[in-house]
Amino acid sequence: MSGLTHFDAAGHAHMVDVGDKQETRRIAIARGTIRMLPATFALIRDGKAKKGDVLGVARIAAIQGAKRTADLIPLCHPLALTRVAVEFELDDALPGVHCVVQVETFGRTGVEMEALTAVQVGLLTVYDMCKAVDRGMVITDVSVREKRGGKSGDWKAEDAAG
């Protein structure tokens, strides 16, 4: 891995110039989890939350989060996303919900930040819709699981050390 790219020689923050980079298909997959009380999990699983379809609303929020990443992260490039796929996995054993987001574009820079933002916004929406019954929910283990495309090539979390 090279040095930090968002700082110039004088140490000032700047947006990286990607103008000379080749356009390629870029994919990133991120994942995160929200743990909750069994009763809260049952409300989500059974579709009985007072605010409505928790995972349906969270899916739309995650998609919107991916699309708005450049507005939230100061040095992120605004990207024309070609796909945002959001999946929720109910986990009885936790109990909790896993959110997996795949973001794609055809461009000059990766979509890892968009995938991470989408996961966080989706899980924050679950929290918001259920906080009246469970203020102790915990969002955890948010990470990039995979990235494809670009000069640095493909990467999977299991390839990382530690």
Swiss-Prot record:
Pathways involved: Cofactor biosynthesis; molybdopterin biosynthesis
Reaction catalyzed: (8S)-3',8-cyclo-7,8-dihydroguanosine 5'-triphosphate = cyclic pyranopterin phosphate + diphosphate
Listed GO MF terms: cyclic pyranopterin monophosphate synthase activity
Transmembrane segments: none
Pfam families: MoaC (PF01967)
Keyword Lyase applies: yes
Subunit structure of this chain's protein: Homohexamer; trimer of dimers.
Protein name stated in the entry: Cyclic pyranopterin monophosphate synthase
GN (gene name): moaC
